[in-house]
Amino acid sequence: MTYEKPDLKRTKATVSFKRIYLHRASEFPGPWLCQCSSIMAQYHAWRGDLPRYLHVLHEKYGDFVRYAPNHVSIRHCDVWEDVYGFQRNVSKYDTTYSPFRLAPDFTSTWNTSNVDVHKSRRKLLNKLFSEQHLDDYGTLITVQVDEFMRQILEALPKDKDVMAGPINFAYKSDVVAREIITSLVSGQTYGFQSGDAKSASLLADISKFERKLYLLGFAPWLKMLPSFKPTLALAQWIVQSSKQGLASGSKNTLVAKMLAARDEEKDVEFSRNDVIADARFFLLGGSVTSSSALSATLFFLLHHPVEMQELYDELRGIFPTYEDIKADAQLMRCKRLRAVFEESMRLAPPVPTLLPRLVGPGGIKACGRYVPEGVVIGAPCWAISRDKRYFDKPNVFKPDRWLADSSDPVALEKMLLATRASQPFSYGPRACPGRALAFRENGLLLAKLVYAFEMEPVQDKSIVEESLTGICDGLVFNQLDTVGAHEVELMVRYRLRLDGKTKRRVSGN
């Protein structure tokens, strides 16, 4: 018996023809290579610039773009309600979310694909981030923020007119965010802010592992590589933090509140495995989005001194002294503080790429078009947030767009449209429940920084220099897309404000 040698060229041509013309997603436009293969999506995921790549594709092909054979990106403000809203015929795309599970049946509220399980557990989780509980976390947050500010103050030169630094605020914000989430989960700190070799090494391991988990969603075969396993130090940190939270006598940690949570209708509890799974997600994903939002906001303020001054004026008008700035309800009333965060997260979302959803049996109608069963779809947050249909001068940093009220109906209508389009914490039943907590944490940090210091940017790698289709004005913050967004760096010089009063308030003298 003889065997014919397989004709690889013919096989490739046949597969390509079927994917381009006969595939269930073939009606959606996109580059021919993207229609044939996932290699471009994998490449840009590896580069960390997939959100910007999707923006370029949408500028060329329109609102619907096929960026991989079975993946369609939808750039339209209605996609949030049509795809991510309640009772939609979609589920989380398991290939993307399964790498984040400790075991196949060991799921967190965030990465479970089971709609009923998510609904039950999310109802409990929402209680952890209600206004009733936010004040309970204030002390843990304040302790770490004060330590952060103490270190910044100690680095000042004796000559108060000389700028300190430069220091990498992107790294510093990541450090304090990791410390805060560790203390919120376990009631204890790890010592990230100490800056010792052990904590610095673990921080590097965490960042690398988050990136690896993200890449596994695009290329699952990578999990066979030994380098894609967590390091021993990382595994110990996750396990120990979870166990400490379970053993802690404090009632104000996330773990303690998860254990105490009850579903009023069904009397459902978080099991120990549920707690560990959610604690793991908080530890890995709960800090990167916070640090990203803080870094982005500081970046845009540094490059827009007028807006920086307006924020400072608001803070001085609300808080007579530095010590009056606390993680409480009064901080939530700082309208301009909220506006600069909203605008920064629009231009540099903490989760800039799309969160994929698998279309269920019977298909779905999204943004006026039918999408067949089995197609993976999602909203490209970065691209939608720079769409001129929803924002005046979409690439320009304009916090005032979020401060409209009923006295200006036109501006108010534009703000409502912008609110529909910009969803940095996602939308619907799967939206991030910790938005209010993130604002308290970041709001406290930013308010104290702006209140205490004059700051200026240093020429660094924080600005994207490449030319992007449709973007000819404004600045693009250099983010590396992973589980959330990691910033390349943000180098800053700073000094105490020159009124001479702040120094006593910050140092406590």
UniProtKB/Swiss-Prot annotation:
Top-level enzyme category: oxidoreductase
InterPro entries recorded: Cyt_P450, Cyt_P450_CS, Cyt_P450_E_grp-I, Cyt_P450_sf, Cytochrome_P450_monoxygenase
Residues noted as binding heme in the record, renumbered to the chain: C432
GO-annotated biological processes: biosynthetic process
EC annotation from Swiss-Prot or TrEMBL: 1.-.-.-
Pfam families: p450
Required cofactor names: heme
Molecular functions (GO terms): heme binding; iron ion binding; monooxygenase activity; oxidoreductase activity, acting on paired donors, with incorporation or reduction of molecular oxygen
PROSITE patterns named in the record: CYTOCHROME_P450 (PS00086)
Pathway the protein takes part in: Mycotoxin biosynthesis
Note: Gene clusters encoding host-selective toxins (HSTs) are localized on conditionally dispensable chromosomes (CDCs), also called supernumerary chromosomes, where they are present in multiple copies. The CDCs are not essential for saprophytic growth but controls host-selective pathogenicity.
Function: Cytochrome P450 monooxygenase; part of the gene clusters that mediate the biosynthesis of the host-selective toxins (HSTs) AF-toxins responsible for Alternaria black spot of strawberry disease by the strawberry pathotype. AF-toxin I and III are valine derivatives of 2,3-dyhydroxy-isovaleric acid and 2-hydroxy-isovaleric acid respectively, while AF II is an isoleucine derivative of 2-hydroxy-valeric acid. These derivatives are bound to a 9,10-epoxy-8-hydroxy-9-methyl-decatrienoic acid (EDA) moiety.
Similarity-based family: Belongs to the cytochrome P450 family.
Name the record gives this protein: Cytochrome P450 monooxygenase AFT11-1
Species this chain originates from: Alternaria alternata (Alternaria rot fungus)
